[in-house]
A protein has these predicted regions:
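Juxtamembrane helix-capping/reentrant segments at transmembrane boundaries
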Residues: 1, 41-67, 135-146
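Hydrophobic transmembrane alpha-helices
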Residues: 3-29, 33, 73-118, 123, ...
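Juxtamembrane interfacial secondary-structure elements that flank transmembrane helices
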Residues: 31-44
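Voltage-sensing domain
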Residues: 62, 68-72, 78
């Protein structure tokens, strides 16, 4: 993406920075989804079978076609849309606030990565204990970052995209623009699904 931008005359440090942040986020997401079996043949998010059973096959297919598939695509577009606002500020130097927000994004990404690992370790240990016939306690992770919050990874994910929205705002001096829709809709999605 950065190569094409340079080749087409869109070279800009701000756009490069945003591209790097999105790529790092995507790498974490890809790794985490893959290790849970998401890329195996027939693999899917653990919530879909639960929802499919709750709704029944016909209602689930309708829900999938009218909400899940379109919403995810629109949401991915909207959370990345602040890049468009950043592009409008191309050619201006990066501001200190943008660099501070980029650092905060990386801290949140690290926070989410640690939470993901803690959750992974917990579920691996829980499965091993079940297989050995040992008690697993209440079944909830309550140590590490999960001692602070039931969903520290969700907090970090939502916060990253609010920070991502704020970066181009810092570049343009425009505190509010249409691309806020991505952060708002992501927040609503997490709120509605937990």
């Amino acid at each position: 993406m950065t190569y094409v931008a340079y080749r087409e005359g869109f070279a800009d440090a701000r756009l490069d920075l945003l591209a790097v942040l999105i790529t790092l986020w995507g790498a974490r997401l890809t790794y985490n989804f893959g290790r849970k079996g998401g890329y195996r043949k027939g693999g899917e998010d653990y919530r879909w079978p639960i929802l499919r059973e709750r709704l029944g096959p016909w209602k689930f297919q309708l829900f999938n076609a009218t909400f899940i598939a379109p919403y995810q695509n629109v949401l991915l577009y909207l959370i990345a849309a602040p890049v468009h606002i950043a592009w409008q500020a191309k050619g201006t130097p990066l501001r200190g606030a943008e660099l501070a927000l980029a650092a905060l994004f990386l801290v949140l990404l690290g926070f989410e990565t640690v939470a993901d690992q803690q959750q992974w370790n917990f579920h691996q240990e829980k499965a091993a204990r079940k297989q050995r016939g040992e008690p697993v306690g209440d079944g909830f992770l309550s140590s590490g970052l999960f001692r602070i919050s039931r969903h520290p990874n969700y907090f970090a994910e939502i916060s990253m995209w609010w920070v991502f929205y704020a970066m181009p705002c810092a570049a343009t001096g425009q505190a509010l623009n249409w691309t806020i829709a991505g952060a708002v809709l992501l927040t609503l999605l997490f709120d509605g699904s937990t």
